[in-house]
Every structure is written in C-alpha cells, then in structure tokens.
C-alpha cells in the first residue's frame, strides 16, 4: 500500500545511494586484523591514528557537494558512535553530521545508539554538541536514560547521562520513568540491576511514580516474589529473594510506601498474605515503620491482623503436619507481636472477630493469640508493652535485633524486646 512506501524507500536509499560513502569512511577507520579482513570491531582499531583521520577529512572535503552527502555523513556518525570512535565522531560532526538523524531501520538516533553500545565518552561528546539528552525514539518511546537503565552493563552510560543533566523523572506517554524501566527489566533471568536502581534513586528518581496502568515501584518486586515459587532452583529463588530485599531496602530508604492502596500494589499486603514464605522481608518492612493497615484508608480497607488470622486458620484447617503447624504458629505469634509493638495504640478493624472453628488443628492456640490481641485493644496498656514500643522505636532503623542484644538488660527482657518466637529460646543471647 501507499503508506508502506516511504519506509521501504528510505531503507533502499541507504543501500543504493549513500552506502558507498559510508563504506569508504568506515573502510578508512578499520584496521587489518589477523584474517587479512579489515575489522572495525578489533580492539586494535587505531582511531587515534592521525593518518586515518586525515584520510577521513580528505574524503569528506572531496564529497561535500555530492548528492546524499548529508545522509551519508550522518549515517556514518551512527556507525562510529556504535564503535565508540570519539575522534572520528568529532570530525563527522565538524563536517555537518546530523545529531537527530535516525537509523532508517531502528529509528534510533546516534545518542540512543551510543547508549545501547555502552559508549559513555561518545554520549558525552554528542550531548556537548547539542544532542537532545531526553529525546525519545519513535518506535518504543525510550529516552537514552531509559535504555541505560535497562541493562547493568550500561551503568557507565547511566552515570554519565545523569552527570550531564538527563531528566531523571521524565516519563513516556504511559507514565513509565527510567526507575520503572530499571525495575521492569529486572526479570527473573537477569536480576543484577541493583546498581542502576541505586544510581537513579540517588539521582532523585521519584519513588511514587506510577504508569497509567497503575504499575508502581513495588509492582515489579511483587511480581518477582510471586514468580519465585515456580520453576526455579533453590539457588535462583535465593537470588530473587536477595534482590527483592535489597531493592526494597533502597526504595524504603528513599521514602517509598509499601502499604499503599490498592492492596494489589502493596508489598506489605502481599507479604502478609503469605507471611510464612516471606517472613524476613515482612519483618524488615514492619521494623522499618511500614503500616500494617492500608496507609490511606486504615484497617477498614485491609488490616494486617485480619490477614494474619485468615492465613493461620486457612493453613491450620488443611495441614496436620506438626512441625509445619508449630513453625506457622510461631511465625504468626511473632508477626502479631511485631504489629502490636509498632505503635502504642493498636488499630483493629471495627468489630474484629476470628472464627477458629475452621481450624481443624490448633484452634485453641489461635484463639489464645486472638484473646491476647483483644485484651490489648480493650484494657489500658501494660507498662511493659509501652516500654517495648518505646525502646523499639528508639532503636530504629532496622535491624533492631543486634542493638537490643547490646543493651545492658537481663536476657529475659531482651527476649521480650526482640520478638522472635522462631528463635529457639535464649541460646543466641
């Protein structure tokens, strides 16, 4: 059809009309490699060699008035950009190469190409010569910063772009920022993007950024943790868990709220629903001050106490295994106490009740936990509870465990402050 023609026409023009000039220029910059073939990729590429660069100048002077000179010199810039040949790029710019020239196939500009090939020095050269540092490509709408944040290998370009003043919070039309790109590209196969995420956060990336689809910084962490249960080796699962923990630490350190609404985007809510599986991360969230209720609407929207008892009853109605049950109850008790100890007044949903009749096993233990919670809600708080809340608050930030162990207090008090029913008694004190 008519609409497809310009693209094909542009594609053919590369091959037919300005390709000879491009080939001649690149041929001058190549060095003969061992196979007798000229190679641009070889590390011995002597792009600083004066005679090569003089030869390039002579060709450009000779061809200045030839048809398609502008396209040829601009396309050559794309190619030397990919190879990181700074002196050659400088000459091409001097001879009129267009910084906004788009590759006829990918529609990337030289700056995009420099980032994709991780050439920070070329990135700097292009920006200093006036390349638009925040320009989005036509196909994917990615900025140079987006591309730099997607691969750990491009960290040098990411650092350079931020130093050169790239807008760290620029977003595409769907609201996706470079930080959301970095998080989204940290999929299970490739989870080493922590440094990029850290660099963006230190550069002022907004932790409250969200896409039009409602994806937030925690969407990707939740997705990865959910994936962990499937088809991974033990080692891969540990890698994912470590990565998610580290990223959550970074996000919280920069003010992210893991207890937001809707519940589907709340990391706290996600961990509460399966507290047995994500216990260390959940402990970290609570000890770092995350709300155990919806931070926007309070316990009427969702409540950590409600979710915890639901989880306990559901599992205890299905599994009879004694070690499994006792581990679950210990973690449940620890979780309930962590939530109780996070503030002086506890917040429960109104008319909060727990029906333990569904628990086929250990219903009485769950009932006891529930009664201690209701007791705390109804009566004036005991001094020891208030002291625990106060001391733990003073020992923040996370982790508070080692700080408690260092206090000049009797072991029994330390144990009460530590809140860890999964630890075997007092041996570690």
Language-model regions: role of each:
Residues 46-48, 79-85, 113-119, 147-154, ...:
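Ankyrin repeat A-helix N-terminal signature
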Residues 138, 150-211, 219:
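Solenoidal tandem-repeat scaffolds enriched in leucines and small polar residues
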Residues 55, 87-88, 121-122, 153-157, ...:
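Conserved ankyrin/ankyrin-like repeat signature
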Residues 58-64, 90-98, 124-132, 159-167, ...:
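Ankyrin repeat domain, specifically the short helix-to-loop turn at the C-terminus of the second helix
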Residues 3-93, 97:
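N-terminal segments that cap or nucleate solenoid repeat domains
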Residues 73, 106-107, 140-141, 175, ...:
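Start-of-repeat signature of ankyrin repeats
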Residues 68-69, 99-103, 133-137, 168-171, ...:
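Ankyrin repeat boundary signal
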Residues 3-24, 30-31, 271-284, 288-429:
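Cullin-RING E3 adaptor/co-adaptor recruitment helices
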């Amino acid at each position: 059809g008519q609409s497809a023609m310009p693209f094909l026409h542009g594609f053919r023009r590369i091959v037919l009309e300005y390709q000879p000039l491009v080939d001649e220029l690149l041929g001058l910059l190549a060095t003969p490699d061992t196979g007798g073939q000229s190679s641009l990729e070889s590390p011995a590429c002597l792009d600083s060699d004066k005679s090569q660069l003089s030869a390039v100048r002579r060709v450009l002077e000779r061809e200045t008035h030839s048809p398609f000179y502008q396209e040829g010199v601009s396309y050559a810039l794309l190619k030397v950009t990919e190879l990181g040949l700074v002196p050659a790029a400088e000459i091409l710019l001097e001879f009129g190469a267009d910084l906004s020239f788009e590759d006829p196939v990918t529609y990337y500009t030289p700056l995009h190409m420099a980032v994709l090939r991780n050439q920070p020095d070329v990135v700097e050269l292009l920006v200093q010569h006036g390349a638009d540092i925040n320009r989005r490509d036509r196909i994917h709408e990615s900025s140079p910063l987006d591309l730099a944040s997607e691969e750990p290998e491009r960290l040098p370009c990411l650092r350079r772009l931020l130093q050169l003043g790239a807008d760290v919070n620029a977003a595409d039309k769907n609201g996706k920022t470079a930080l959301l790109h970095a998080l989204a590209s940290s999929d299970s196969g490739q989870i080493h993007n922590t440094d990029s995420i850290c660099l963006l956060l230190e550069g002022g990336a907004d932790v409250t950024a969200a896409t039009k689809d409602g994806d937030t910084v925690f969407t990707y962490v939740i997705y990865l943790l959910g994936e962990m249960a499937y088809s991974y080796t033990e080692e891969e699962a540990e890698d994912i868990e470590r990565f998610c923990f580290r990223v959550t630490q970074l996000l919280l350190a920069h003010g992210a709220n893991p207890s937001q609404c809707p519940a589907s985007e709340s990391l706290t809510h996600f961990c509460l629903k399966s507290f047995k599986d994500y216990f260390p991360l959940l402990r970290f969230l609570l000890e770092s001050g995350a709300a155990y209720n919806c931070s926007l609407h309070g316990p009427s929207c969702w409540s950590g106490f409600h979710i915890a008892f639901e989880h306990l009853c559901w599992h205890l109605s299905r599994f009879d295994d004694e070690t499994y049950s006792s581990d679950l109850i210990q973690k449940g008790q620890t979780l309930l106490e962590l939530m109780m100890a996070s503030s002086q007044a506890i917040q429960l949903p109104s008319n909060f009740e727990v029906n333990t009749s569904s628990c086929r096993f250990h219903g009485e233990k769950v009932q006891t936990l529930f009664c201690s919670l209701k007791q705390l809600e109804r009566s004036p708080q005991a001094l020891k509870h208030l002291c625990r809340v106060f001391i733990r608050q003073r020992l923040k930030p996370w982790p508070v465990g080692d700080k408690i162990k260092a206090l000049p207090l009797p072991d029994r008090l330390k144990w009460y402050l530590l809140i860890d029913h999964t630890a075997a008694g007092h041996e570690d004190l």
